[in-house]
Amino acid sequence: MRNYELVYVVKPNSDEEVREAILNKVKEVVATDGEIVKVDTWGTKKLAYPIAKFTEGFYVLVNFKSAVDVPKEIDRNLKINENVIRHMIVVA
């Protein structure tokens, strides 16, 4: 298993239920072949530049350990979700 770090930015106008649903989906995918180490909610922050006409975003950092194929599945799920405006997964 490898250590990964995921940061994703959710639309600032999305409600708490949407944010929780996104995080629960990430947790569900990681649980298939890995474990969540830490979840850190940074809250709403100003973006360095506008993304999809938004100047702010709600940031979430997730550290997890998993097999190599899990980040690909998380990436696929976050690309599909219209409330996620940007995400990045790196090997920690």
Swiss-Prot record:
Signal peptide: none annotated. This is Small ribosomal subunit protein bS6. Binds together with bS18 to 16S ribosomal RNA. Belongs to the bacterial ribosomal protein bS6 family. It holds the Pfam family Ribosomal_S6. InterPro entries: Ribosomal_bS6 (IPR000529), Ribosomal_bS6_sf (IPR035980), Ribosomal_S6_plastid/chlpt (IPR020814), Transl_elong_EF1B/ribsomal_bS6 (IPR014717). It comes from the Bacteria. The keyword DNA-binding does not apply. GO terms for cellular component: cytoplasm; ribonucleoprotein complex; ribosome. PANTHER family: MITOCHONDRIAL 28S RIBOSOMAL PROTEIN S6 (PTHR21011), SMALL RIBOSOMAL SUBUNIT PROTEIN BS6M (PTHR21011:SF1). GO terms for molecular function: small ribosomal subunit rRNA binding; structural constituent of ribosome. It comes from Clostridioides difficile (strain 630) (Peptoclostridium difficile). NCBIfam families: S6. Keywords: Ribonucleoprotein, Ribosomal protein, RNA-binding, rRNA-binding. One of its GO terms (biological process) is translation.
